[in-house]
Swiss-Prot record:
Name of the protein: Putative membrane protein insertion efficiency factor
Entry annotated with the keyword Protein transport: no
Subcellular location: Cell inner membrane
Pfam families tied to this protein: YidD
Membrane topology, as annotated: Peripheral membrane protein
UniProt entry tagged with the keyword Cell membrane: yes
Main location: membrane
Family indicated by similarity: Belongs to the UPF0161 family.
Organism: Bartonella bacilliformis (strain ATCC 35685 / KC583 / Herrer 020/F12,63)
Entry GO CC: plasma membrane
Keywords: Cell inner membrane, Cell membrane, Membrane
Function: Could be involved in insertion of integral membrane proteins into the membrane.
Top-level division of the source organism's lineage: Bacteria
């Protein structure tokens, strides 16, 4: 992602740099993902089979769709990221659609796997 900075030009960032509402849940979720990226991710190494990586995907999903939906989307993505799972380019959808409800989190699995079939 490339972010515009008024004085320095373009800055390369690791996570989603688009506009998103800064609600407490989203700030908590993205903060925890960022903490993981700074600490544990460096020790584990880059072993993700997807582009963007699972932590970048979860960060963007939480930023775009909120803590509840974004965390479920990220969880299903992480579960699929294994040697027997899928791989490739899997972007976060820009909108969820009308068939996704907060009380049916298993529907979010369809979003994270439909790009790779």
């Amino acid at each position: 992602m490339i972010e515009q900075h008024p004085k320095q030009g373009k800055i390369q960032t690791r996570n989603y740099a688009g506009p998103w509402r800064k609600t407490p849940g989203r700030l908590l979720g993205t903060g925890l993902i960022r903490l993981y990226q700074i600490t544990l991710s460096n020790f584990i190494g880059n072993q993700c089979r997807y582009m963007p990586t699972c932590s970048e995907y979860t960060y963007e999903a939480i930023a775009r769709h909120g803590l509840w939906a974004g965390a479920w989307m990220g969880l299903f993505r992480i579960v699929c990221c294994n040697p027997f799972g899928t791989h490739g380019f899997d972007p976060v959808p820009t909108s969820l659609g009308s068939s996704y409800y907060f009380y049916k989190p298993w529907c979010y699995r369809k979003i994270s796997t439909k790009h790779n079939k």
